């Protein structure tokens, strides 16, 4: 079995008989906006992962019948599954599957592939106490400026009303093909328990929907990242999860660049910006080739030293070069020295 991205930007799986590498055939084909992940083997089954529509999934395939099914551990719409083959014996139908979501801390189940029976064997404890049943996890989509649908993952109190009166902490990153998993973080719940919704905008530039999702959010397409985020913010307002001026941006480093850019482009949507070591002086950094990290960063942002086009493009969005009035915004930042 061969896991490859040759002529398949988001990978595919090929197979051949032993010593017949020249006779490879497609086993798992490439799929649009789906990242085909790795796989594990039992004697009679193949376990594999993929991320489709920014949602991680696990599948099991019977080698003899070639029938494949998704392993569903939870009724929650989105989460982060994982498989671990703890035992040396591969002649088994019993595996261990991990699960967590934005509402549920990490769990480990024993799962029987044939019977589909599961048994909880480990539950991550939250010292302050936590009941996942008190919360709801949702997945919605916003239409960006060019028609691209951008996923939004969110978690909130089950008792929270969708009446356009709640505040939202809306996270984004959008760079380096880095995917943001809809995973659990106990620290968020001090806000969620106060009625604030936590959401993730899976904007372009990251890798949530595969390589094309990344490519359309870098270099000359970088503004797609910011426009995607603004589209997500407006959609949350339209769907009455929040209201205009009820959103706080949250992000760091390259995500801080996203925050700085959207603060300049649509300041009226936000009441605050939580920026962690934000990359807001983009132009000055990209012009200084003596900085050790700058040459490697040109692959993400473009080289403004050699290209007038990139110089003008970066200058048009770099937060430090495009300030507006922030009198109504709270702008805490955290910087490393």
Located regions from the model:
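Beta-strand C-termini and the immediately following turn/loop, strongest in propeller blades
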Residues: 1-7, 45-54, 96-102
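Structural motif
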Residues: 8-14, 54-59, 104-109
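Structured, non-catalytic alpha/beta "coupling" segments that mediate domain-domain communication
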Residues: 10, 94-117
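Multi-bladed beta-propeller domains
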Residues: 17-40, 64-85, 114-134
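Cap/lid segment of the alpha/beta-hydrolase catalytic domain
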Residues: 124-239, 243-245, 252
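Active-site-proximal cap/loop segments of hydrolase catalytic domains
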Residues: 200-329
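Single conserved hydrophobic/aromatic residue that forms the stacking wall/gate
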Residues: 328-337
């Amino acid at each position: 079995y061969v896991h490859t991205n040759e002529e398949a930007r988001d990978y595919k799986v090929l197979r051949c008989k032993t010593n017949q590498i020249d006779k490879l055939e497609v086993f798992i084909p490439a799929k649009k906006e789906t990242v085909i992940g790795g796989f594990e083997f039992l004697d009679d089954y193949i376990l594999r992962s993929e991320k489709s529509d920014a949602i991680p999934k696990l599948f099991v395939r019977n080698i003899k019948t070639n029938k494949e099914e998704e392993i569903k551990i939870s009724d929650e719409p989105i989460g982060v599954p994982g498989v671990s083959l703890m035992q040396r014996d591969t002649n088994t139908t019993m595996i261990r599957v991990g699960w967590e979501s934005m509402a549920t801390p990490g769990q480990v189940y024993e799962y029987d592939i044939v019977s589909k029976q599961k048994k909880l064997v480990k539950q991550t404890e939250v010292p302050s106490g936590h009941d996942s049943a008190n919360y709801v996890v949702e997945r919605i989509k916003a239409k960006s400026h060019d028609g691209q649908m951008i996923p939004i993952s969110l978690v909130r109190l089950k008792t929270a009303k969708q009446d356009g009166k709640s505040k939202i902490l809306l996270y984004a990153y959008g760079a380096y093909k880095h995917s943001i998993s809809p995973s659990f973080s106990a620290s968020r719940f001090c806000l969620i328990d106060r009625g604030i919704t936590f959401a993730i905008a899976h904007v372009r530039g990251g890798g949530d929907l595969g390589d094309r999702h990344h490519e359309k959010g870098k270099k000359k397409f970088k503004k797609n990242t910011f426009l995607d985020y603004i589209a997500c913010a407006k959609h949350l307002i339209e769907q009455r999860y929040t209201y205009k001026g009820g959103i706080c941006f949250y992000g760091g480093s390259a995500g801080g660049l996203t925050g700085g850019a959207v603060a300049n482009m649509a300041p009226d949507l936000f009441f605050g910006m939580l920026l962690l070591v934000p990359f807001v002086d983009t132009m000055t950094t990209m012009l200084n080739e003596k900085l050790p990290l700058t040459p490697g960063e040109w692959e993400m942002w473009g080289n403004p030293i050699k290209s007038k086009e990139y110089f003008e493009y970066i200058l048009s969005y770099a937060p430090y070069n495009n300030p507006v009035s922030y009198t109504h915004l709270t702008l805490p930042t955290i910087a490393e020295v």
